[in-house]
Amino acid sequence: MKNMLLMSGSKYKDTAYLVHTLPWLAQFLADYKGKKVAFVPYAGVRRSFDEYETAVKNALQSLELEIVSVHRGKQHRDIIEQADVIAIGGGNTFCLLKQMYEHDLLDAIRAKVNSGTPYFGWSAGANVAGSSIMTTNDMPITYPPSFNALNLFPHQINPHFISGKMQGHNGESREERLEEFLIVNPQSLVYAMPEGTALHIQGEQATVLGAQDILCFSEKMQLDTKAVNSTFNY
């Protein structure tokens, strides 16, 4: 059974890096102390893979996990196949997906997660768990072979969702950008995840975690609000 924790971001309000995720992760990984976590650092454009691995190790130290970045393997895919848990960090989603294709990780991750290996990811790492990365907020600074992602959660995800416009901002709001996507892709569902929220996926059900509701947009921007602590079939 699929077991995934998809988190909107690595910070919430003024919390330190990944601190707000620790209670969720402690429960999610309660049976995995001492186990090997394959970490995918490809989204971290402004820091090296070594630096990203160290940052995540330090932030999650209390969970007593063996975190190993995939770049440590002769073949990156080897680390995925040896892992007890898979984690994908945030950053630029286009860079992330491009390198996942280059290192042939998509099928390996998909197979592991579908067979029960826990998966957690934040921001871009949540994005790529969905059907495609077409509702990311990131600039397309590089071009993956396809926008198609892992499709473990068979819908679109928009992390870091903020409703409306900031004063003085004359560009499109997030709702307007998602409306554009749904005009072109009217059969899709988009799960907009505000800061400090997460989806816990168990099999074919999802539970909303955090301090805010998650919004599900469909054709013509019809809204289905998923309340905090609610569980629904997706």
Swiss-Prot record:
EC annotation from Swiss-Prot or TrEMBL: 3.4.13.21
Localization per Swiss-Prot or TrEMBL: Cytoplasm
Main location: cytoplasm
GO biological process: proteolysis
Pfam families assigned: Peptidase_S51
Catalytic activity: Dipeptidase E catalyzes the hydrolysis of dipeptides Asp-|-Xaa. It does not act on peptides with N-terminal Glu, Asn or Gln, nor does it cleave isoaspartyl peptides
Gene Ontology, cellular component aspect: cytoplasm
GO molecular function, one term: serine-type peptidase activity
Keyword Cytoplasm appears in the UniProt entry: yes
Cysteines joined through disulfide linkages: none
Keyword Membrane: no
CDD domains attached to this UniProt entry: GAT1_Peptidase_E (cd03146)
Keywords annotated in UniProt: Cytoplasm, Dipeptidase, Hydrolase, Protease, Serine protease
Active site per UniProt: S123, D138, H160
InterPro entries linked: Class_I_gatase-like, Peptidase_S51, Peptidase_S51_dipeptidase-E
Origin superkingdom: Bacteria
Family according to the record: Belongs to the peptidase S51 family.
PANTHER family documented for this protein: ALPHA-ASPARTYL DIPEPTIDASE, PROTEASE S51 ALPHA-ASPARTYL DIPEPTIDASE
Function: Hydrolyzes dipeptides containing N-terminal aspartate residues. May play a role in allowing the cell to use peptide aspartate to spare carbon otherwise required for the synthesis of the aspartate family of amino acids.
Protein name: Peptidase E
Name of the coding gene: pepE
